[in-house]
């Protein structure tokens, strides 16, 4: 594919930035290789809708090779490698990529002339004890599906209270409550979507639980939601969430997270499952 006179551009990550770079380089005098551990591109702004069962996961994912094919003739210089980038040797100009074959992992050393890094981001728990073990993050399609399944399993477990004498009322309530930490765009969207899910489909599907209002708490360490947005939008978001039944708590700093919920620095405990 690569000739001595054709530079190779390797792009790590087939997210928005990686695909944008590949499209800009399509048809140019270079060979482009996209590297990603998934063979699909997920539309991350809609992860919260997958997590709350509003849309199916396949509706926000597109195969990377289909995206390349849609580039038409210009995309002939763009290729894709399914694997996970593990490191780069800039002196030798090689990218180490871990691939799987027949269930076995091995490493490839992919040469490059130019390397573009767009691997995305990971959730920062700021060192809060218990967050990694007991909390969910929402950065990938797999995490969104995992959260959705957890919500549904929690409601199924709570519904057993009618036949399970060992389930206490407090345990039943805890399984019906969700806590969202962070009042940015994702947190606001997720809290609102959870409230809609509990007030709508889950209330209809679990009538014996007697849900009268959603049990969703949104914790924000700052003095307002959506920092950086115009004040009128920040105020509207809080009013709207409150009207939907979301318990919005500002200045709420999480000290630790346990299997029973979140514990705040002011001594409060917000129970959830």
Q: Where would I find each of the regions flagged by the language model?
A:
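Internal, well-ordered alpha-helical segments in soluble enzyme and binding-protein domains
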Residues: 143, 147, 174, 187-190, ...
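FAD-binding core/adjacent interface of flavoenzyme oxidoreductases
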Residues: 2-6, 78-177
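Beta1-alpha1 glycine-rich phosphate/pyrophosphate-binding loop at the start
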Residues: 2-82, 178, 185-229
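A Rossmann-like FAD-binding core segment of flavoenzymes
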Residues: 71-97, 195-273
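Short hydrophobic core segments
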Residues: 12, 110-120, 254, 272-273
């Amino acid at each position: 594919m690569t000739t001595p006179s054709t530079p190779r551009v390797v792009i790590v990550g087939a997210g928005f930035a990686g695909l944008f770079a590949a499209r800009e380089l399509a048809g140019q005098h270079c060979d482009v290789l996209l590297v990603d551990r998934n063979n699909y591109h997920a539309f991350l702004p809609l992860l919260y809708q997958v997590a709350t069962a509003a849309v199916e996961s396949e509706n926000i994912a597109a195969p990377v090779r289909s995206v390349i094919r849609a580039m038409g003739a210009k995309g002939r210089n763009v290729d894709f490698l399914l694997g996970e980038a593990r490191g780069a040797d800039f002196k030798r100009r090689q990218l180490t990529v871990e691939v799987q074959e027949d269930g076995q992992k091995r490493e490839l050393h992919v040469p490059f002339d130019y390397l573009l890094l767009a691997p995305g981001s990971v959730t920062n728990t700021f060192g809060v004890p218990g967050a990694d073990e007991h909390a969910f993050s929402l950065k990938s399609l797999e995490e969104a599906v995992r959260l959705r399944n957890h919500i549904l399993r929690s409601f199924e477990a709570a519904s057993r209270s009618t036949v399970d004498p060992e389930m206490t009322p407090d345990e039943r309530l805890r399984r019906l409550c969700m806590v969202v930490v962070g009042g940015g765009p994702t947190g606001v969207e997720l809290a609102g979507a959870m409230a809609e899910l509990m007030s709508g489909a889950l209330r209809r599907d679990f009538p014996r639980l007697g849900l009268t209002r959603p049990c969703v708490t949104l914790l924000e360490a700052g003095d307002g939601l959506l920092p950086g947005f115009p004040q009128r939008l920040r105020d509207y978001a809080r009013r709207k969430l409150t009207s939907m039944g979301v318990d919005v708590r500002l200045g709420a700093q999480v000290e630790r997270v346990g299997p029973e919920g979140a514990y705040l620095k002011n001594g409060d405990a917000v129970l959830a499952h």
